[in-house]
Amino acid sequence: MISIMMKVSLAVFMLAGGIIKVSRVPFQVEHWRHYQYPLWFLTVTGILEIAGALAMTAGIWNRYAAIGAGVLFVVLMAGAIHAHMFRARQSVIMAIQAMICLIVSIMIIMGSYT
């Protein structure tokens, strides 16, 4: 039950983030410029987040989908942490959401092997 709640929570969070990126909401575009990434990468990242959210939802029934989505999210969240802390030189506080998603993704991956 906890595993399902973690998967659903992570999927909803990532889906929302993906939609915000693909829609190019002004505050997200501003953040992306601050990270000094090209705007096409914003769209690609959003599409990957949406695809991962769908795969994580499928992961409720298929552990391989959960593992694949978890690995994708680990890569994306490592990139998000890097963007906040090193590219934009923000404090650790700005990267907390990405760190939580990274930890939850790792927990889902590890839990899928049992």
Curated annotation (Swiss-Prot):
InterPro entries: DoxX (IPR032808). It is a multi-pass membrane protein. Coiled coil: none annotated. Keywords: Cell membrane, Membrane, Transmembrane, Transmembrane helix. It comes from the Bacteria. The chain crosses the membrane at residues 38-60, 64-86, 91-113. The keyword Nucleotide-binding does not apply. It is found in: Cell membrane. This is Uncharacterized protein YdgD. The gene is ydgD.
